[in-house]
């Protein structure tokens, strides 16, 4: 049976269920490595790798056909010399982080409007001075410019 290695501990149980189901339909067995590392003596049995492996470890995946990074940018993994074969297919997880980035945008906007970084510094120094002026997003017009799922 073909094998898939999934690296990292960031997946929720429903992700595991979906990966297991899809892999089984495609004839793959799945092994999870929450610590992000596949022992070198086992790496050669995997045709598919998902996660963010150490670049130096990629050559130990001697049967590797497809590496899918668990992130959007794969620039650090573009060098063919990293892989046991120049035929390894490299893909990313672009599109998986839209909700996370949207929520991050709201969080950072509120932090800026409420001077969160200044308050953290003041609290760390045990200074409880006057309240800094704060703005609300209520009634504001906000424009977000970008392209794609996270832009």
Set out the residue ranges of the language-model regions.
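N-terminal glycine-/charge-rich "phosphate-binding" loop or analogous flexible N-terminal tail
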Residues: 1-48
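Glycine-rich NAD(P)-binding loop of Rossmann-like domains
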Residues: 119-151
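Phosphate-coordination loops involved in phosphoryl transfer and adenosine-cofactor binding
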Residues: 1, 87, 138-141
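A generic local structural motif
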Residues: 16-17, 34-38, 51-56, 77-79, ...
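Short, well-ordered beta-strand segments
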Residues: 4-6, 68, 91, 143
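Electropositive phosphate-/nucleotide-binding environments in soluble metabolic enzymes
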Residues: 13, 99, 103, 148
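Phosphate/diphosphate ligand-binding glycine-rich loop within oxidoreductases
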Residues: 45-123, 134-135
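Short beta-strand/turn micro-motifs composed of small residues
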Residues: 7-8, 51, 71, 146
